[in-house]
């Protein structure tokens, strides 16, 4: 579908809400969507060691909430494991370049809700005539006890909308076209001057969702201690350089 016009205005956002967990890994071997090694060891071994996930038919369902998180082309990218292979490699939803620095991530409801609150205000200020909403099917699975459109409904209250759940979302950032996963991508469009929103964006049961679960507190603890360990290692390297 191609849109054009002398007075057509477009704005776009992407919402993740997944937070990095634990230490960093370097992609040392990959081939397209096949992630072979992280820090020189089979990629599957990382998921087995840190999440105790078995290499069986349930691998996809157990890793769905723990995609890999990294920065690329000035934006955050998530990649979800699809299957584990006999050689210890992992088939991902899309490619990850060799040299990328990745971390395992987890979905934090509070962060997701805060992102939706912030970005829905941005979209409302744009004053769209129409919203195109594309959300990864993995996000639908994440909100297991909610309606499938739970995190989409606030945007639907701003302007008429259409879209679908997807297996990959595309968005151009800083001149680069990026493929996302586990991401909510919204394109807002209008002709002429901004319009007043048809309603106010709200999330049902928002307060109950903001209660911090145990896993979130543990993840914060791990992330902070990992950062402190990295800082200590950097200081030790600096001291060693001085002693040479």
Label each residue range with its predicted role:
Residues 1-159, 166-241:
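Small-residue-enriched flexible segments
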């Amino acid at each position: 579908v191609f849109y054009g016009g002398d007075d057509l205005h477009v704005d776009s956002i992407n919402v993740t809400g997944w937070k990095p967990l634990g230490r960093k890994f370097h992609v040392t071997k990959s081939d397209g969507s096949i992630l072979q090694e992280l820090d020189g060891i089979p990629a599957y071994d990382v998921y087995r060691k840190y999440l105790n996930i078995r290499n069986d038919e349930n691998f996809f369902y157990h890793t769905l909430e723990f995609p890999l998180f990294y920065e690329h082309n000035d934006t955050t990218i998530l990649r979800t494991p699809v299957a584990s292979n006999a050689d210890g490699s992992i088939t991902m939803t899309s490619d990850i370049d060799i040299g990328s620095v990745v971390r395992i991530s987890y979905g934090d409801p509070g962060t997701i809700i805060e992102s939706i609150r912030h970005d829905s205000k941005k979209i409302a200020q744009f004053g769209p005539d129409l919203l195109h909403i594309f959300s990864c099917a993995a996000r639908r699975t994440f909100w297991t006890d909610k309606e499938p459109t739970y995190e989409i409904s606030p945007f639907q209250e701003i302007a008429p909308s259409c879209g679908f759940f997807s297996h990959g979302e595309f968005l151009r950032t800083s001149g680069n076209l990026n493929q996302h996963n586990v991401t909510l991508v919204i394109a807002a469009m209008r002709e002429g001057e901004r319009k007043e929103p048809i309603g106010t964006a709200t999330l049902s049961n928002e307060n109950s969702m903001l209660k911090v679960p145990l896993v979130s507190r543990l993840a914060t603890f791990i992330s902070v201690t990992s950062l402190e360990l990295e800082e200590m290692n950097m200081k030790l390297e600096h001291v060693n350089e001085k002693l040479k």
